[in-house]
Amino acid sequence: MYSQTKIAIPIFQAKKEDVIKVAEDCIEKGADVLEFRIDALDNPNFDDIKEIIEEINFPIIATNRISSEGGSFKGSEEERIDILLKCAPLVDYVDIELQSDDRYIKQIHDTGVTTIVSYHDFHKTPEINEIMYIVEKEQKLGDIAKVAFMPNDLDDTLKILAILSHCENTIAISMSDLGSYTRVMASKFDSPITFAAGRDVTAPGQIDIETMKSLLNMDLNLME
């Protein structure tokens, strides 16, 4: 048996040459996908972004994270979306936040790229019915739903497992050390993607890729 869950490593670097260097390191460590955090670049312009994507030549999630959800992009919303639209033909996935205008999400989805519609809350975990509402809305707008919440107790992390067990094509994460196990459990529910750390931790509770691969392989061996 094998897991169909891909391991993605976010690349959060300010300089073009560092993005490429870290990407090569993460590929060598066994990443299945790289999340290119475009918003981390010092001066993101499409010529540099295109060069990076072509140089890496590996499955990529293009993310240009909005500041209200932990991102660093400093331009206008129109500039942020324009970069994602230009990236769409060059990458495997585009991540766009649910709070973005629906017309922008539709424009990206209409390019044909696999569209991840995401929602992050770094302060709390809502009630299960609210999470379900968010996921269902994301699924209507895109191809893959993504939610990530900060747990305040163990019960909050169990809500994430419930979402994973009931919702297809969904990435669901409970952040912090308390919720880190949900990143491993994602493979149990055939979540399309889980996130691990390469050189740097870019979100609370990320597990380094070596440990993640070891845990996933251990789990799969027990199931054989």
From Swiss-Prot:
It comes from Methanobrevibacter smithii (strain ATCC 35061 / DSM 861 / OCM 144 / PS). Its EC number is 4.2.1.10. Keywords: Amino-acid biosynthesis, Aromatic amino acid biosynthesis, Lyase, Schiff base. Pfam families: DHquinase_I. InterPro entries: Aldolase_TIM (IPR013785), DHquinase_I (IPR001381), Type-I_3-dehydroquinase (IPR050146). This is 3-dehydroquinate dehydratase. The active site is at H120 (proton donor/acceptor), K146 (schiff-base intermediate with substrate). Pathway: Metabolic intermediate biosynthesis; chorismate biosynthesis; chorismate from D-erythrose 4-phosphate and phosphoenolpyruvate: step 3/7. One of its GO terms (molecular function) is 3-dehydroquinate dehydratase activity. 3-dehydroquinate binds at E35, F36, R37, R65, R183, T202, Q206. Belongs to the type-I 3-dehydroquinase family. GO terms for biological process: 3,4-dihydroxybenzoate biosynthetic process; amino acid biosynthetic process; aromatic amino acid family biosynthetic process; chorismate biosynthetic process. Involved in the third step of the chorismate pathway, which leads to the biosynthesis of aromatic amino acids. Catalyzes the cis-dehydration of 3-dehydroquinate (DHQ) and introduces the first double bond of the aromatic ring to yield 3-dehydroshikimate.
